[in-house]
């Protein structure tokens, strides 16, 4: 049967070529780049090809087979040593394209690796590897704001509820973008450094084996007697098909399997006594914690001791080889090597790079290769370094030169970090986007609000006194306690589904101005087959691992009680004009206000005499409209006539929602947020806004949604609240998605209101 070859995408090809060039220059394999090539089980061809070219760049002569296994052999005669690592990791493949343009997926492997694997994909950024490109995508999630009013919202625990959004609105648009059934899908979360020297990211436990082996292969020589083969196999998650093929082709006298060690049945991966990152190399045996001195595991243990490499012997299942027919036998001298990981087979699986450096040293000692000095400062395994490489630039970086001013502003504001109570960086980002004349007139009040007044402030003026309000803050977490074991206890800032963030990487933003990577820990028992998510609670504390084992070590990282946390953010354009990024709520509103100020210009008072405008970028909206309440109280004696609160219209334009509430479509215009939990716009004013929009050919929608808006706190002082926004789906998730056409419409409308209301 003719095998399916999946073409290399341009992004992956660029990564692979750069890695090959680095190897050819003598710099060794560029693991930081290679680690970003998707390698879903059964679809490892791109990574396998890159590994093959990297080996060739080292002057080796790699071989391959019908399953895309890659291996190199040096030396001759006996014994034949075989060292193997697998390339693949779990993921998905497109299984259906809906008429509405969403992609359905099937898991690879088809059985769920653990009880939370699918749950941790909901509302997460992803990438679809087509034959011609890599497409940004996001798995759909339930809107946080709409869920409380739902009868039976999706549980977000089963693959039947997974939909992938690439920004298409029809099956034809999907196919026009080059996507099709059988394209592999991976989570798009680059590795990050956790604490000082740990690393976390999707597939970390599946990458570490081939990363160590590729580094060792770059120095492979004939120093050891006999024959040595280093192999990179495919489809290990699909029953060890590549390993089965390799052992059929290349019988060996002794073998080391390097990578993820499978815990025997009945032992949970999170067992308290298990080795932790930083404890050294793991040597896998079939039982106990002590290897026999006469077997290969015992020999490796003795070798590690002689090299002063920390190690532990642990019980481990042999690498899986399933399928039809009898599997080839493992060599009698067989051992496994790995390193401890936390949160295995989750998007935040974590290991210590120091352990991985030790693993590479042990393999080199086994092969009698010279052992280089490797430290955290010069670490070939620091995959997180790749986040600032040119080839790894987000699509938005590559199109900035041709992007509209609105898109440039939105990108700058969404990538600023600032949870409620910690908005300084966002204030500075807004100021940086304002023109010089506006920046000079802007003030920060006692509540941290950014305030810009324009036009006539004289009493008795003929024109209206209008306020345009958007909030600066975003949801997140705050450190409430540093535990004795170094973990952080944190509380929620704002409301959201915890499962969108637990089991994922996070950033601790310290008072010293730097960020420390961490992992939001999953609930206890998550690794058990019968695990059920606990009921949603905003008051239950969460815990964060930052790579330390004591409170003192955590404090040495600069972390203190009161520091705040967010997820790492990346601005991800989808098809057409859609954009997915955490904090579109309310950085879109902030952007609309900035664009309006630019459009009005410094001569507004002369062009529109008698009118007074105030633009307020507020703080603390997500925790109770705090900044808006402070500003409204401060101007209560001379309350403005109208406040236009510019905030998200949480939309049901999603396969995860019913259309009974919040029926507004992305791409069809701004929305008059006539009804929400905090306010009802006066019907006459709603009609007036709609009429003005129609008269000026500005696309407009109107409706009812959930959530509150800043304008509600003004009404007690006599101000009318006319709330407006733009449709957004997957609210308070990592993939909040909007259409920039709606932002343009909103900006045009706020300018019109500023001059003609």
Feature map (PLM): residue ranges:
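N-terminal hydrophobic/helix-forming segments and targeting peptides
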Residues: 4-9, 14-757
């Amino acid at each position: 049967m003719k095998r399916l070859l999946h073409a290399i995408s341009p992004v992956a090809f660029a990564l692979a070529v750069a890695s090959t060039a680095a190897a050819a220059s003598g710099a060794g394999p560029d693991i930081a780049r290679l680690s970003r090539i998707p390698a879903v089980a059964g679809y490892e061809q791109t990574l396998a090809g890159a590994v093959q070219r990297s080996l060739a760049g080292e002057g080796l002569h790699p071989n391959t087979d019908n399953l895309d296994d890659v291996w190199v052999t040096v030396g001759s005669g006996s014994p034949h040593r075989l060292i193997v690592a697998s390339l693949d990791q779990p993921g998905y493949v497109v299984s259906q394209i809906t008429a509405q343009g969403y992609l359905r997926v099937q898991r690879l492997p088809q059985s769920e690796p653990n009880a939370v694997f699918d749950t941790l994909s909901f509302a997460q950024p992803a990438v679809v590897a087509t034959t011609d490109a890599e497409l940004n995508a996001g798995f759909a999630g339930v809107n946080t704001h709409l869920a409380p009013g739902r009868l039976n919202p999706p549980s977000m625990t089963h693959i039947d509820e997974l939909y992938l959004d690439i920004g298409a609105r029809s099956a034809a648009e999907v196919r026009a973008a080059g996507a099709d059934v059988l394209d592999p899908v991976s989570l798009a979360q680059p590795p990050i450094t956790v604490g000082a020297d740990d690393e976390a990211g999707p597939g970390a436990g599946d990458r570490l084996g081939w990363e160590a082996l590729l580094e060792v292969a770059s120095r492979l020589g004939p120093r050891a007697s006999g024959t040595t083969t280093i192999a990179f196999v495919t489809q290990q998650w699909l029953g060890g098909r590549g390993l089965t093929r390799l052992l059929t082709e290349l019988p060996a006298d002794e073998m080391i399997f390097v990578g993820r060690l499978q815990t025997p049945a009945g032992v949970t991966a999170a067992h308290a006594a298990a080795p932790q990152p930083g404890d050294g190399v793991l040597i896998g045996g079939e039982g106990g914690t002590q290897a026999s001195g006469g077997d290969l595991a015992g020999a490796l243990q003795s070798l590690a001791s002689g090299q002063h490499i920390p190690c532990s012997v642990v019980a481990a299942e042999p690498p899986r080889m399933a399928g039809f027919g009898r599997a080839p036998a493992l060599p009698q001298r067989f051992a496994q090597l790995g390193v401890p990981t936390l949160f295995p087979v989750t998007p935040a699986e974590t290991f210590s790079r120091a352990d991985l450096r030790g693993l590479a040293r042990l393999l080199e000692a086994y092969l009698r290769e010279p052992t280089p000095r490797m430290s955290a400062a010069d670490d070939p395994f620091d995959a997180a370094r790749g986040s600032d490489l040119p080839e790894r630039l987000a699509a938005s970086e590559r199109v900035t030169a041709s992007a509209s001013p609105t898109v440039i502003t939105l990108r700058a504001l969404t990538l600023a970090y600032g949870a409620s109570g910690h908005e300084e960086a966002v204030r500075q980002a807004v100021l940086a986007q304002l023109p010089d004349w506006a920046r000079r007139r802007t003030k920060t009040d006692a509540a941290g609000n950014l305030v810009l007044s324009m036009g006539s402030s004289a009493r008795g003026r003929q024109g209206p006194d209008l306020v345009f309000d958007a909030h600066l803050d975003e949801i997140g977490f705050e450190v409430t306690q540093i535990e004795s074991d170094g973990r952080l206890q944190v509380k929620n800032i704002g409301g959201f589904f915890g499962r969108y963030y637990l089991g994922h990487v996070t950033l601790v933003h310290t008072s010293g101005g730097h960020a420390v990577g961490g992992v939001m820990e999953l609930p206890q028992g998550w690794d058990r087959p019968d695990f059920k998510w606990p009921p949603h609670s905003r008051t239950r504390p969460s815990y964060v691992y930052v790579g330390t084992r004591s409170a003192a070590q955590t404090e040495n990282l600069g972390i203190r009680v009161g520091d705040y946390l967010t997820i790492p953010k990346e601005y991800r354009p989808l098809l057409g004009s859609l954009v997915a990024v955490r904090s579109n709520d309310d950085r879109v509103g902030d952007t609309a206000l900035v664009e309006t100020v630019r459009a009005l210009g410094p001569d507004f008072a002369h062009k529109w005499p008698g009118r007074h405008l105030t633009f307020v970028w507020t703080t603390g909206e997500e925790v109770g409209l705090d900044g808006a309440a402070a500003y409204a109280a401060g101007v209560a004696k001379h309350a403005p006539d109208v406040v236009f609160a510019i905030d998200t219209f949480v939309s049901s334009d999603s396969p995860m929602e019913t259309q009974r509430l919040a029926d507004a479509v992305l791409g069809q215009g701004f929305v008059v947020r006539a009804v929400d939990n905090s306010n009802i716009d006066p019907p006459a004013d709603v009609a007036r806004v709609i009429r003005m929009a129609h008269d000026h050919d500005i696309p407009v929608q109107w409706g009812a949604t959930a959530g509150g808006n800043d304008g509600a706190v003004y009404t007690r002082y006599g101000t009318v609240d006319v709330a407006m926004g733009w449709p957004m789906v997957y609210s308070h998730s990592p993939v909040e998605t909007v259409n920039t056409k709606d932002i343009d419409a909103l900006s045009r409308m706020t300018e019109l209101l500023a001059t003609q209301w």
